């Protein structure tokens, strides 16, 4: 296995975005691609590591730059300043997501007929909005994602959706989970929700502990959600991944 990584520039109109590409050069044939939608901190090392993990599974991993310019905000105010406009204008967000999706499908190592997306926190919302917006995904997986629907009507989708959710997440109350289930059913999705008890926001991020119970790493929920992820990707990609 020879995993190679490199930055990949793409455009959303005049906005330059810098994705992070990871793939195994050992096998020359085009492979399924898993897009990684970053959390509110931007396309950081965590998102890049997830892309590398996808490459290790035999897929192409492509971490999107949904803020543009590879912005990596550090303070809460700076993170909100970048995330807020996209969260408030979901049409703008979908346009940005479509640009990243298109860029990935044009990569020579990618089989554009086998696309999936995963996302964390804000990236979970991005992943769900890809499904809502009708992007051609085989699978879409949200980890402790924001679940609220956009104002615009969602499109029908054949994507298989997995929502990995901490039941005590203050950013996605139980009623929002129920609402999402109804929404995905109306869209025609094959969907599943894995809700983890005694689990809050950011449960996949090692070292996270806000001290007030709102954000905390949970190794059991992290492991269980990752196993569910590998299972779903294996289901939709079959033997198209090297190690699937």
Residue ranges and their predicted role:
Residues 1-244:
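N-terminal cap/leader regions of alpha/beta-hydrolase-fold enzymes
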């Amino acid at each position: 296995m020879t995993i190679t990584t490199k930055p990949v520039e793409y455009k959303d109109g005049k906005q330059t975005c810098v994705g992070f590409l990871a793939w195994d050069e050992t096998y020359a044939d085009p492979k399924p691609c898993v897009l990684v939608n970053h959390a509110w901190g931007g396309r950081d090392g965590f998102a890049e590591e997830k892309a590398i993990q996808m490459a290790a599974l035999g897929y192409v991993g492509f971490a999107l730059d949904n803020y543009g310019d590879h912005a990596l905000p550090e303070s809460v105010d700076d993170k909100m300043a970048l995330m807020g406009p996209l969260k408030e204008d979901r049409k703008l967000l979908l346009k940005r997501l479509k640009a990243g999706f298109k860029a990935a499908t044009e990569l020579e190592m990618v089989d554009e007929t086998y696309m999936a997306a995963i996302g964390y926190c804000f990236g979970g919302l991005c992943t769900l909005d890809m499904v809502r917006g009708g992007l051609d995904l085989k699978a879409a997986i949200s980890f402790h994602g924001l679940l609220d629907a956009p104002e615009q009507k969602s499109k029908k989708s054949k994507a298989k959706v997995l929502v990995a959710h901490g039941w005590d997440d203050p950013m996605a109350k139980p009623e929002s989970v129920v609402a999402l289930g109804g929404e995905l059913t109306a869209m025609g999705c094959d969907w599943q929700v894995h809700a983890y008890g005694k689990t809050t926001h950011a449960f996949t991020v090692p070292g996270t502990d806000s001290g007030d119970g709102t954000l905390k790493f949970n190794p059991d929920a992290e492991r269980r959600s990752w196993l569910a992820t590998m299972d779903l990707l294996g289901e939709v990609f079959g033997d198209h991944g090297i190690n699937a």
